[in-house]
A protein has these predicted regions:
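Metal-dependent amide/peptide-bond hydrolase catalytic core
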Residues: 1-195, 199-209, 216-217
C-alpha cells in the first residue's frame, strides 16, 4: 500500500472535522485504524474490506425456532494505488475459501470491480514530471473558480468512490479526470433521505460555467 505524501496529510488537516466529531457522526466510541494511519487518514488513504449487508434465517418480528440453512454477506473493497481489482478479488476469494470449515459450502460471486485511480495536482510531490498543459490549466482554473464562488481555497483529498470508468479513461485514452466533491456529511450520500444543498449547487453552477470557459482557448 502506497503511503500518502506529507502534503496530502497536511491537506487532510485542513478539513473542518475532528476525530471526535466524526465518531459522534458515526455513533461509535472508538476507531481501529490500520497501523501507520490516523482514523481520518485511514478513511482517505487506506484500502478497505467492507461488509455492506448480511442476511440469513428468520428476520421478522418476534422469535422463531428456525435454524437457517443459508446465509449471505455482501462485501466490497476500496482499492488504493498499486492494487488492482483482479488481484484483490483473487486474494479475497482465496482467503474466504481457505477458511471455510469442511462442514460448510461457500460460494463467492464477483459482480464487478474497477482499478483505483488517483491524479496528483501538477507541481505537488508525487505528480508526473511531464503533466499535460491542459491538466495544469484545469487545476489552476478549478482552484480559482472554486475559491471565487465559495470564498475558500479547495482542499485536495482522496475520496473512495465507484467510478471505474475514470481509470479506464486514463488507461485507454491517457486522459486524467478532475473530480470535485461538493457534498457535506448532512447530505447522507447514497443513504436514506439523501439531499444536496441548493445554495452549494447554485455556487457550483456558476463556478463550473466559468471553469469550462477558462479551459477554452480564446
Amino acid at each position: 500500500v502506497q503511503s500518502p505524501e506529507d502534503w496530502e496529510r497536511d491537506e487532510l488537516k485542513k478539513m473542518p472535522l475532528t476525530e471526535d466529531q466524526y465518531a459522534e457522526f458515526l455513533g461509535i466510541e472508538h476507531f481501529y485504524p490500520p497501523k501507520g494511519f490516523s482514523p481520518l487518514e485511514s478513511l482517505r488513504f487506506a484500502p478497505t474490506l467492507e461488509f455492506n449487508g448480511m442476511g440469513g434465517g428468520y428476520q421478522g418480528e418476534g422469535s422463531k425456532t428456525v435454524i437457517h440453512s443459508e446465509a449471505f454477506v455482501k462485501i466490497t473493497c476500496r482499492l488504493v494505488p498499486n492494487q488492482t481489482a483482479d488481484e484483490i478479488t483473487r486474494l479475497v476469494k482465496e482467503v474466504i475459501e481457505s477458511r471455510c470449515p469442511p462442514q460448510v459450502r461457500v460460494e463467492v460471486k464477483v459482480t464487478g470491480g474497477g482499478d483505483p485511480y488517483v491524479v496528483i495536482p501538477p507541481g505537488k510531490p508525487g505528480a508526473d514530471f511531464d503533466s499535460p498543459a491542459l491538466l495544469k490549466k484545469a487545476f489552476a482554473a478549478a482552484e480559482n473558480r472554486i475559491e471565487e464562488a465559495f470564498g475558500t481555497h479547495p482542499i485536495y483529498l482522496r475520496e473512495g468512490g465507484s467510478i471505474p470508468i475514470i481509470g479506464d479513461l486514463k488507461r485507454v485514452a491517457g486522459l486524467d479526470s478532475l473530480l470535485i466533491g461538493l457534498f457535506t456529511n448532512e447530505d447522507n450520500l447514497h443513504a436514506p433521505n439523501e439531499s444536496f444543498h441548493l445554495g452549494i449547487m447554485n455556487k457550483a453552477i456558476d463556478a463550473f460555467e466559468k471553469f469550462f470557459l477558462d479551459l477554452v482557448d480564446r
